[in-house]
Every structure is written in C-alpha cells, then in structure tokens.
Amino acid sequence: MNAMKILSGILLAALVLGCGGCAGAPEEPVSTLLFAPGDGGSKYYRIPALVTADDGSLVAVADRRLESMGDLPNKIDLVARRSTDGGRTWSSVIPIAEHRGDCGYGDAALVSDARSGELLCIFASGRGLWESTPEAPIDINICRSGDFGQTWSAPECITPQLWGAACANPLSRGWYGAFAASGRALQLRDGTLLFVVAARTGRAAPPLVNYVCMSEDGGRSWRLLPTPVDMNGDEAKLVERADGSWLMSIRNPAKGRRKYALSADRGATWSEPQRWEDMPSPACNGDIVRYTLRVEGARRNRMLHSIPLDSVERRNVSVLLSYDEGCTWPVRRSVWSGDAGYSSLTVLPDGDIGLLTEVGNWERGFEIYFTRLTPEWLTRGEDDGR
C-alpha cells in the first residue's frame, strides 16, 4: 500500500513537472495576412512598412500596385491598416496617398515623432528613379497623422529642400533623382529625425550613393548632410547606438553580405563600409531597429535586424538580435523559410516584436503578413528581452 502511494506520488510529480515544462515553452509566432493580390481591386501589393504609434497602436503600410508589380512610374497607392490590440486584429484599409492619373505614390518609410505624437510617412511619387531628371525629378513627399494613423494629411512635396533643379543646394541640384529607403525612418533620442536616400547623382544608372536627410523641427524642414556614406549602396537604414553614434545598414547591390558604416560625429564623416560576415543577404531591403537600452532600464543593450538570410535568393526572412550594438548578430531565427523579400520591424509596447513581410516572389506575386513574435521564441528561451 505504501509502495503504491509512493509510486502514485512519483507519477503525479512527473506529470506536474511535464505540464510545467509545456507551459514554459516560448509562444510560437502568430502571422496575420494583411494585404493580398485582389484586395481592393489591386493586382499586386509590395513594400511593407511598420511602426508603433505613440498610443501603442500598430500601423502597417504597403504599396497597392494596381496594374503592375513594378516600381514608379505606375498606378500605385499607399494604404495602411491599424491594430489597437498588438496585431491580433486589424482595421479596414486606410488610404494615405492615392494615385492621380499616372502619378503614383510608393516606397513608404515610417517614423513616430515622440515629441509631437505625430506619425510621418515619407515616400516617393511621380516619375520613376530611372526616368527622373534634375528638371523633372522623382519627388519625395510627407504625409502626417495626428491621430495615430486613423487619418492622414495631403502629401507635402519636400523635393526642393533636398535635390533637383529647384533646390538651392549645389551638391544635389544636379542630381537625377533619389528615393528614401522604405521601412523605418529614425528618431534620435534628442528628437532629430533622419532617413537615408539612395541617390542617382548623374545621368548614368547604378551605382547609387547613400546620403542622410535630417530634420530638427519635427519634419517641417529638411536638409541633406553633405557626406556620402557609400558610393555603391542602395536602400539603407539607420539606428542610434548606445553611445550616440550612428550605425547604417546598407543593401549590398553585389549580393553576398550586408554592408554597414559608422559615424561618430552626427553624420559629418563616415567609416568605410564593411561587410557583416555573419549576415548573408541577396541584395534586398530589410530593417534595423533599437530593441532595448540599459539607460532606459533594460538589463542589456539590444538591436534587431530583419533580412532574408540567403546570399543569393530572396527567401528565409529572419529576425536577428545583437548584444554588442550591431558588431555581431549571434541570435537569429527564420520566420519565413520560403520565398520572401522586403520586411519591416517594430517593437510592441509589451516588448514583443512585430514583423511585416512581403511573402512570395515575382512570378506569383506577394502577400504581406504581420507576424508577432516574442523575445523568448527568438532566443529559444534564453532571453526575455527585459
């Protein structure tokens, strides 16, 4: 009888421990389809951009490419969907900028201004990059939202502040065109707003050159920083390091490995671009964002990067984690193992991670999914992100 009680106790303890282990397993990522071919009468969708608004809501933006999968000049609208519950449910489609005739709008970069609470959407319009000239350039515009993405202002053209024949800056007056890298723009801790353009500085096609655009008044006025970052770059993103220096992650047109450069003097000078040997990349856009900072109460400084981790093909979109301010990326997990391209990242108010990804390829088209994942899942239970 006593032996039976002991055996029953052992079995019960084993069951309790087993259930406890199951309960402690990291939550698996959950993906939601937000934009798909055929939605809204559009044949195609591309170019994800994602941001967390000041009230904690999520805003996901995409190009609604009505007739062609190609870039500008085409009939393209910028559209958004919002979530107020961490990405579990989403609003109906919200227009940001809709094409007029053959003038389309595309390639959105998003940033939330912590000073004003406004959302800024920065994007291209009109002529395509390769059709652009100094006299008739591809335009860059801003739309603003003062209600966390529910409504948006009319597009404001800021091209004359930055490039083209109407610009007073002798450096960029003769440029043939430029566009902001889609995904995330950046607000520094002092409130300064930044985004990176890929500039076509002469009549010839590539290479493109990366330059930083800066605003110190909430995006009301902009200026071009004079130092080129990469003379053979493309879509590039910025993040502020813990020491205040800037790290730029650069699409490598040669494929192989992602490139980066550093500035310790607010963009006045830049290091020579180097390759992240631990980050293969197939000449594709991705995102880099700050995750946590020790000065804000976290145990560690952390950055996140999303990119297709493949040196040749656009597939295997993964999220990577750095503990040394972007020097190395030792933690990585694949979110979309098949064909997938551009992606955008944001941090949710509870510390979970949001990823917006175009899933598919040029043959069958792209669907755009939002994925919510936890730091525990990303690190296989090693880090809770606090």
Language-model-derived ranges and their functions:
Residues 8-18:
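Bacterial N-terminal signal peptides
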Residues 1-6:
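Positively charged n-region of N-terminal signal peptides that target proteins for export
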Residues 22-386:
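Asp-box/BNR beta-propeller blade signature and adjacent active/binding-site loops
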